């Protein structure tokens, strides 16, 4: 799901940069975890993320504590895109807690995220899964937190040059909760 979230964020940024709807859209990848998470961050940089930050944490933490720690390091952002499933416990609750921490709108469990084809709307059209196989279509305006399912997008393949550059790219590491 995190790879799908990265692809959604890259697609939104590509669209905004191509259409001039934003000064410059950047994709900043942020994770909370031990040093071994740097490999995943390097993969994200190779795929097109502009910067990566790891909030250092070596122990398993409550989802709300994770959200608070991430919110402290998000900085100025319009949109946060998360995977809807975490590798640790798989609760998918971090995006909801994060939206609360950031006082942002939230759209969770998304199957599809569409950027507007024309520049008449700043809203993203999203499709989310409901119980019983039903779907809900929403228009989401930033600031917002989105969580996407793994099926929402397939991550683009990184070029060899980008992969090699990512191996030595800086990853900012900040102290997290312990």
Task: Identify the meaning behind each predicted range.
Residues 1-32:
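N-terminal beta-strand-loop-alpha-helix module at the start
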Residues 2-7, 37-38, 88-94:
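Short glycine/serine/threonine-rich phosphate/pyrophosphate-binding segments
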Residues 32, 38-73:
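A glycine-rich helix N-cap at a beta->alpha junction
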Residues 50, 78, 143:
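Conserved acidic residues
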Residues 76-86:
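Short beta-strand-loop elements within alpha/beta enzyme cores
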Residues 89-106:
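Short Gly/Thr/Asp-enriched flexible loops that form oxyanion-binding sites at enzyme active sites
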Residues 111-178:
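Electrostatically charged, flexible surface regions
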């Amino acid at each position: 799901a995190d790879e799908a979230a990265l692809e959604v964020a890259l697609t939104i940024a590509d669209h905004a940069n191509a259409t001039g709807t934003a000064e410059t859209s950047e994709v900043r990848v942020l994770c909370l975890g031990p040093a071994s998470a740097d490999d995943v961050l390097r993969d994200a940089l190779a795929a097109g993320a502009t910067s990566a930050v790891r909030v250092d944490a070596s122990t398993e933490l409550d989802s709300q504590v994770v959200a608070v720690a991430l919110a402290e390091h998000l900085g100025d952002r319009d949109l946060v895109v998360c995977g809807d499933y975490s590798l640790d416990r798989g609760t998918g609750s971090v995006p909801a807690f994060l939206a609360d921490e950031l006082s942002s709108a939230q759209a969770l469990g998304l199957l599809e995220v569409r950027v507007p084809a024309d520049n008449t709307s700043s809203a993203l059209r999203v499709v989310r899964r409901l119980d019983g196989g039903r779907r809900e279509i929403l228009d989401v305006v930033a600031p917002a937190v989105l969580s996407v399912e793994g099926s929402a997008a397939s991550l683009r393949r990184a070029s060899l040059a980008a992969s090699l550059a990512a191996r030595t790219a800086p990853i900012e590491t900040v102290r997290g909760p312990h």
